[in-house]
Amino acid sequence: MADTRELPVFAYIDDVKQLQELRQYLNKHDSVKLDPNGPSETAQNMIEICSTLNVLPSWSQDVDLVLNSISSLIVVVPGEKCEPVVDSFIKNVAPQFYKGTGWASHAGIAVRVLSNLYKGYSNFHTVQEKIFKALVDMCAEARLIGELECNLETLQDRFNTWKTPVEGQREILRAVHRALLVDQRVDQAAKVMTALLGTYTEKDAAAARDDAMECVRTAVVDPKSFSFDHLERLSAVKALKTSDPLMFTALELFISGTLKDYKEFVAKNPKFVTEHLKVDETILLKKIRLLTLMSLAEEKNEISLDELAKQLDILADETLEEFVIDAIQVNAISGKINEMARTLIVSSYQHRRFGTEQWVLLEKRLKVLIANLKQTHNNVHEVNQRIEAL
C-alpha cells in the first residue's frame, strides 16, 4: 500500500460504496458500459474504472473530483497489486486525452493528480518511476515542466534510488528534453540532451544517431549557447562523422566557423536549416554573427566598425550598434563603441573553444590575481602596523 500520509483525502465513504458511485457516474457517458458493482477484488475493480478515464475530459464537468476520488482509492491497493492499477491509470490519463495548458486545463488537473500519486509511492520505486514518466509527459502538454523538479542532479539522484537501467534513463531524459523544448527552455533542454549523450560509450555510440543529431540541433539553435567543442568529445557525436557527415559539418561550423563559412554551407545545402535544424534561418544568422564577432574579439581587442560591418554583413550604422548592444547583453562579449574613433573596444569575450591553450591562459591569470591579492593584503597589513605604531 502507498503512503497515504502523502496524499489528501477525497472521500469519506467506504471503498465499496465509493467504487459503486464512481461506476454509476462514469456510466452516464454512452461509451462507458461498466457493471454497476464490478469485481469484488478492489484492484480488478479499479483497473476497469481506470480504463474509461480516456473519455472523461470529453464530457465531464468534474474531472478533478473524479480523478482525485480514483487516486484516493488507488493508494489503498496493496503493494503487490497496485502496479497494474497504476498502469491502467497512466495509460488512460495521458496527454492525448487530457489537453490544454496551465493548471486550470484538463492536463493541468492531471498533473496535480499524478504529482500526488508520485509522492504516495516513495517506497515503491518501480511504480514511482512509471508515474514520473507519465508526469513529465503531462507537464509537457500543460506547459508546466518548470513546476517539476527535474534538473540533472535531481534526475541522477532519482535514477540511483530507482536503480534505473541505462535505457530507462535515456527514455526519461528524452521525455524531459521534449518537455523543456515545448516550454521554450532551450538552454536547459540542451544540457539534458548532452547528459543523455553522456550515457553512450564507444561501444554503442553508433546506435545514438538520432539522439546525437537532436543534441547538436538543440545546442546550435539555443540562443544562449556559444561554445560547442565539448560536444565533439562525446562518442555519440563523433559517430556522426560517418552516420551523418552533414550534421557533423554543421557542428564544426558553429564550433569555429564564421558568417562567410555559414553562407557557403547554406548555399551548398539550401534545405538543411529548415529540414534538419528545423529553425528559422534568421535565428541562425544572428547566432553565427555573434560567433563571428567572438572570433574577431579573440584576435584583437580593438575592431574598426567598418571592418566589423564587413565581416558581419551588416550596415555600419545604427543596425550595427544595436547588434553590438545585443552581443553585450547576451554576454558574448563585453566592451563599448568609441564613436569618435569608430571602433569597438573589447574588454572580454567568451571563448568559442576551451582547450589546453585556454586553461593555460586561465591559470596564468589566476596566478596574477592571487599575487595581486597577496600584495594588497601585505600593503594593508603594513598600513595597520604603522597606524598601531602611532
From Swiss-Prot:
InterPro entries listed in its UniProt record: COPS7/eIF3m, eIF3m, PCI_dom
Signal peptide location: none
GO terms classed as biological process: cell cycle switching; cytoplasmic translational initiation; formation of cytoplasmic translation initiation complex; oogenesis; protein deneddylation; regulation of oogenesis
Gene Ontology cellular-component terms listed: COP9 signalosome; cytoplasm; eukaryotic 43S preinitiation complex; eukaryotic 48S preinitiation complex; eukaryotic translation initiation factor 3 complex; eukaryotic translation initiation factor 3 complex, eIF3m; nucleus
UniProt keyword terms in alphabetical order: Cytoplasm, Developmental protein, Differentiation, Initiation factor, Oogenesis, Protein biosynthesis, Signalosome
UniProt xrefs under PANTHER family: COP9 SIGNALOSOME COMPLEX SUBUNIT 7/DENDRITIC CELL PROTEIN GA17 (PTHR15350), EUKARYOTIC TRANSLATION INITIATION FACTOR 3 SUBUNIT M (PTHR15350:SF2)
KW Protein biosynthesis (keyword) present: yes
Protein name: COP9/Signalosome and eIF3 complex-shared subunit 1
Location of this chain's protein in the cell: Cytoplasm
HAMAP family from the UniProt entry: eIF3m (MF_03012)
One Pfam short name: PCI
Function: Component of the eukaryotic translation initiation factor 3 (eIF-3) complex, which is involved in protein synthesis of a specialized repertoire of mRNAs and, together with other initiation factors, stimulates binding of mRNA and methionyl-tRNAi to the 40S ribosome. The eIF-3 complex specifically targets and initiates translation of a subset of mRNAs involved in cell proliferation (Potential). Component of the COP9 signalosome complex (CSN), a complex involved in various cellular and developmental processes.
Domain PCI: 188-351
PROSITE patterns found in the cross-reference section: PCI
